[in-house]
């Protein structure tokens, strides 16, 4: 059974609420947008994985992070269980590091 975490990362940007989305730069998902996330490392707890993904994507640690919802049985080629977390970060503290596989972008929440 595969388990992954997804972190819904919010910030206030130019006076409005924004969420971090990742544009996939490599196949097979090139051009698609996704929430930051990934699979657990062996022996890693859910909370530790969510904190790792938050820091990997934003450079931020020690912020509000809470488990939000768990999805299961998502279909072939996907994790069997996806645990979603909610984070609220200070935009001024973030350090985005795009690479050849993904490009982060803050998108307004309407």
Language model regions located:
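N-terminal strand-loop-strand
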Residues: 1-34
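Active-site segment of metal-dependent pyrophosphate-handling enzymes
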Residues: 1-5, 18, 47-110
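Acidic-residue sensor for enzyme active/binding pockets
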Residues: 23, 44, 57
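Active-site donor-binding loop signature of nucleotide-sugar glycosyltransferases
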Residues: 24, 37, 109
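Short active-site-proximal "capping" loops at secondary-structure junctions
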Residues: 25-28, 40, 70-73
